[in-house]
């Protein structure tokens, strides 16, 4: 039993030397990833009531499933595009600015989904919310990796991935609390991640590596 306790303590000892700034970077990216996962979990829960209203009439389960599948695909296409584009954009405007922009896009378009009047409108908002989600992940992971020493990166990135599971848990609890007020209010909650923007703008700065890349780009 002592050996087991010592091993566990040794595994956790690596976090003791982290600075406040490193924890800040980790928390912001982890929180962003958690809220992204919350959105995807909530979307599956509100899909039926949302499409029942937006399709009009008396849509069948097959109708809802077909349109819901299209909307989910559209969101994932946006996710892919956001990851591709922001992987490039971040090299030019910086990872911190790119992270702030990705969270802004995600928050605005997730909130706008609550104002949808048709499946097409919902799909458009869903696509751009997906762009923000994909961008946040592709920018956030390198930002965390660059904030920590190489010896700790694998561990801290592994811990960061717990945000996905936490987001699913949060999504279920949020729906249990406010789902009864209507599906639109669930989407309005997507504006909450915008709070992180204030933290990013005031507290976070670009890694030294970005400054080096910018300097080499000017010199070339």
Regions found by a protein language model. Give the residues of each.
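Transmembrane-helix signature of 12-pass secondary carriers
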Residues: 1-220
């Amino acid at each position: 039993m002592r050996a087991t306790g010592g091993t566990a303590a040794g595994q956790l000892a690596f976090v003791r030397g982290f600075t406040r700034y490193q924890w800040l970077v980790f928390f912001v990216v982890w929180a962003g990833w958690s809220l992204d996962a919350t959105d995807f979990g909530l979307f599956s829960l509100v899909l039926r009531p949302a499409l029942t209203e937006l399709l009009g009439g008396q849509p069948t389960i097959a109708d809802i499933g077909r349109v819901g599948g299209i909307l989910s695909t559209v969101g994932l296409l946006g996710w892919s595009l956001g990851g591709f584009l922001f992987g490039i954009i971040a090299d030019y405007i910086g990872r911190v600015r790119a992270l702030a922009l990705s969270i802004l896009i995600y928050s605005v378009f997730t909130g706008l989904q609550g104002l949808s009047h048709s499946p097409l409108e919902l799909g458009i908002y869903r696509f751009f919310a997906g762009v923000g989600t994909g961008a946040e992940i592709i920018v956030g992971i390198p930002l965390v990796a660059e904030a920590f020493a190489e010896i700790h990166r694998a561990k801290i990135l592994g811990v960061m991935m717990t945000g996905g599971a936490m987001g699913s848990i949060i999504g279920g609890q949020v729906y249990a609390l406010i789902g009864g007020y209507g599906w639109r209010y669930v989407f309005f909650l997507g504006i909450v991640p915008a709070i992180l923007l204030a933290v990013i703008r005031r507290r976070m700065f670009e890694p030294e590596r970005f400054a080096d890349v910018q300097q080499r780009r000017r010199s070339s």
